[in-house]
Regions:
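Conserved Rossmann-like nucleotide-cofactor binding loop
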Residues: 15, 38, 202
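C-terminal catalytic lobe of FAD-dependent flavoproteins
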Residues: 146, 289-324
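Glycine-rich FAD pyrophosphate-binding loop
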Residues: 24-45
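Flavin-dependent oxidoreductases
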Residues: 18, 173-176, 185-297, 305
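Helix-loop-beta segment of a Rossmann-like dinucleotide-binding subdomain
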Residues: 85-97, 117-160, 181, 261-266, ...
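Helical element adjacent to the flavin cofactor pocket in flavoenzyme catalytic cores
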Residues: 137-186, 193-194, 198, 204-205
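N-terminal Rossmann-like FAD-binding beta1-loop-alpha1 element of flavoenzymes
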Residues: 5-31
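Dinucleotide-binding Rossmann-like beta1-alpha1 core, especially the glycine-rich loop
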Residues: 49-126, 132-133, 284
Length: 324
């Protein structure tokens, strides 16, 4: 294929699309390659809480990413909506955390990073049924509606002239003088200048195809998460709720997500009745009003997992034009 882009990105989930947007804004030409359709894997499947679960228990590197992204998400959503008329539904509905045995660590983290918090008022627990342990209210924590965010990002990039090469499997690469020159795909060869891999759970698998003997290959594995969607009425639940390792996320239209399972099943993203039953039990016990709301969707996605819980963001130490 001719017309070499300045930047070629493999993977067009949220990270790939957002990376492309930054390069477009800086004046570069960009091509995006995806093995399926843009934004249809883990990014689409996620709940959209704009905070890791219990960030004070996460490595410090995660906090730096969280704080920076929290500063920018509202403006990002507004910019995308103005440009595309597709609303990513950034929604600062707040997050109620029901159990915080490490409350001092939690509030210290919030103080350090200037995240507003309050002791949870009893009104926040209306309709909830759970044992409380130092509950914490984070009123400014927001969410985004992932499918709409992805749709808006893609529309923005298409209008900016970004090339999307979808349903395209990358099979191999040619390397000369410490640089990847060409990607070999099932749709033909694609020459590259700078190459960025944003393939999430599939990154280790792809890296082994491109660089089979690479000692720096990332250690990333898929982690399956299953989710449910309840067709509730608007204002049934007014804020996000985290109870132990599961959560409820109310959308603006009233629908409520319940998630998520954590399963190590390689690249199997099928759903199971067992996980559906567990999530249903969690959701309806925590918030009994959901017993009157039908479950309309049940899905699974594969997010990238690492042993340290820290994402890879770096240039390759030997391949000069490769980043992850």
């Amino acid at each position: 294929m001719s017309n070499i882009s300045d930047i070629t990105i493999i993977g067009s989930g949220a990270i790939g699309l957002l990376t492309a947007r930054e390069f477009v804004k800086a004046g570069y030409t960009v091509s995006l390659i995806d093995k399926s359709l843009s934004g249809k894997e883990s990014s689409w499947a996620g709940g959209g809480i704009l905070l890791p679960l219990y960030p004070w228990r996460q490595p410090k590197a995660i906090s730096a990413l969280v704080i920076e992204s929290n500063k920018n998400y509202s403006a990002l959503s507004n910019d995308l909506f103005k440009a595309t008329q597709i609303d990513p539904e950034w929604y600062d509905c707040g997050l109620l955390i029901c159990k915080n045995p490490d409350i001092e660590l939690a509030t210290a983290w919030c103080d350090q990073h200037e995240i507003p918090y309050k002791s949870a008022d009893s009104s926040l627990f209306n309709g909830l049924n759970t044992q409380l342990d130092n509950p914490l209210w984070l009123p400014n924590i927001a969410q985004a509606r992932n499918p709409r965010l992805l749709k808006s990002l893609k529309a923005y990039l298409l209008s900016a002239g970004v090339t999307f090469i979808e349903n395209c499997a990358v099979l191999d690469a040619t390397i000369n003088n410490g640089q990847i020159n060409t990607l070999i795909t099932d749709k033909g060869n694609i020459d590259v200048n700078q190459l960025i891999i944003c393939t999430g759970a599939w990154t280790a698998e792809l890296s082994k195809k491109l660089l089979p003997n690479d000692p720096h290959s990332p250690d990333i594995s898929p982690v399956k998460g299953q989710m449910l969607l309840f067709d509730a009425k608007p204002e049934t639940l007014l804020h996000m709720v985290l109870d132990n390792d599961h959560y409820l996320i109310p959308r603006r239209d009233g629908k409520i997500l319940a998630g998520s399972s954590v399963e190590h099943t390689e690249f199997d993203k099928s759903t199971s009745n067992e996980s559906k039953d567990k999530l249903t039990c969690f959701a309806t016990e925590l918030f009994p009003a959901l017993k009157n709301s039908p479950i309309t969707h049940h899905w699974a996605g594969l997010r990238p997992g690492t042993k340290q819980g820290i994402p890879y963001i770096d240039k390759h130490p030997e391949i000069k034009n490769l980043s992850i």
